[in-house]
Amino acid sequence: MSDNAPVLISKDMSIGHADFWRLFLKIDAPVISDQVSYQAAMRRCHFDWQGGSISVELSAESIRQIAALVLPQTDVTLRYADLSSTQIDEFEKKFERQFQRAGG
């Protein structure tokens, strides 16, 4: 275990809670999906990862409207504890890849 201070990373995402959890659990399956424990009506979870831990907290789900387009909106906070910057970068890359949307 490392003596690294916890690192908080916040993200503003256009996604609802159900879709977030469905995709999130696939990031490092089965490592995450086999041990994740939800708290606060599925708005938080915590799990061990590579000798440290990661906590995820979701804001209340809201709506973002851009002209006629209506999108779900959720603020996501990831808290990394006892992980090196290399490990955090690795998880962040997996996170971004999992939630990447096809664009054109």
Where are the model-predicted features located?
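Short, conserved charged micro-motifs
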Residues: 18-22, 84-90
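Short, flexible, solvent-exposed loop/turn segments with mixed acidic/basic and small polar residues
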Residues: 1-4, 64-71
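A common structural junction motif
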Residues: 28-31, 95-103
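Short beta-strand-to-loop capping motifs
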Residues: 11-15, 78-83
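A short, structured beta-strand/loop element
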Residues: 50-68
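Short, hydrophobic/aromatic-rich segments at coil-to-beta transitions
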Residues: 39-45
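Terminal, regulation- and interaction-focused segments at domain boundaries
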Residues: 1-32
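Short connector loops at helix/strand junctions that flank enzyme active sites
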Residues: 42, 51, 71-75
